[in-house]
């Protein structure tokens, strides 16, 4: 094969390599994006309480028991989809669920909780994504499992339903609560 024929194959080889990478990337599950925060202390924050703007909440609320920190917004259809499951988890499993209201307005967020119920022990209010950036939030819903020492143990991107709870979230929560998954 002469030199000009070899040169002509270079763009084809590059194209095939890029196509293979694209095909591989399309097969990955976007919900399984690893978080650099897993197994590290939850980021510091100082945010107002959604219901009581005069109360400031800090990372200290995460210390003492295992928590699900659920990033949500009233404008998020998937958040409304998972809301009933979060209510069930809080009621039936006694898991502390902390809301992280993200890029929302206070009136709309409060209206959603009034309409659908409030599964949250407390809700952080982050309308400007000040803390969301530190937590690596890029969409809602997202849920973090934080152990009693304030260490992030798992991040879930996307809504939680009964199957996700039973197969993914609950076993991790049980492990850090001292039970067996």
Swiss-Prot record:
Residues 36-178 form the Thioredoxin domain. InterPro entries: Periplasmic_diS_OxRdtase_DsbE, Redoxin, Thioredoxin-like_sf, Thioredoxin_CS, Thioredoxin_domain, Thioredoxin_ResA/DsbE_sf. It is a single-pass membrane protein. It is found in: Cell inner membrane. The chain crosses the membrane at residues 7-26. Residues 27-181 are periplasmic. It comes from the Bacteria. Pfam families: Redoxin. One of its GO terms (biological process) is cytochrome complex assembly. GO terms for cellular component: outer membrane-bounded periplasmic space; plasma membrane. Residues 1-6 are cytoplasmic. SUPFAM superfamilies: Thioredoxin-like. Keywords: Cell inner membrane, Cell membrane, Cytochrome c-type biogenesis, Disulfide bond, Membrane, Redox-active center, Transmembrane, Transmembrane helix. The keyword Membrane applies. Disulfide bonds join 76-79. The keyword rRNA-binding does not apply. GO terms for molecular function: disulfide oxidoreductase activity. Belongs to the thioredoxin family. DsbE subfamily. Involved in disulfide bond formation. Catalyzes a late, reductive step in the assembly of periplasmic c-type cytochromes, probably the reduction of disulfide bonds of the apocytochrome c to allow covalent linkage with the heme. Possible subunit of a heme lyase. NCBIfam families: dsbE (TIGR00385). This is Thiol:disulfide interchange protein DsbE. It comes from Allochromatium vinosum (strain ATCC 17899 / DSM 180 / NBRC 103801 / NCIMB 10441 / D). The gene is dsbE.
């Amino acid at each position: 094969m002469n030199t000009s024929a070899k040169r002509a194959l270079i763009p084809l080889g590059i194209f095939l390599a890029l196509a293979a990478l694209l095909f591989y990337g399309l097969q990955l599950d976007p919900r399984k994006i690893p978080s650099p925060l897993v197994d590290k202390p939850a980021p510091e924050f100082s945010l107002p309480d959604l219901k009581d703007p005069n109360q400031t909440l800090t990372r200290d609320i995460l210390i003492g028991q295992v928590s699900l920190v659920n990033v949500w917004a009233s404008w998020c259809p998937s958040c409304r989809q998972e809301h009933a499951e979060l209510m069930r988890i809080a009621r039936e499993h006694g898991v502390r669920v902390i809301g992280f209201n993200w890029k929302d307005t206070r009136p709309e967020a409060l209206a959603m909780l009034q309409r659908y119920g409030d599964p949250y022990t407390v809700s952080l209010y982050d309308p400007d994504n000040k803390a969301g950036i530190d937590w690596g939030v890029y969409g809602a819903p997202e849920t973090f499992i934080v152990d009693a020492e304030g260490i992030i143990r798992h991040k879930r991107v996307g809504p939680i339903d009964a199957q996700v709870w039973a197969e993914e979230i609950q076993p991790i929560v049980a492990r850090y609560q001292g039970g067996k998954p």
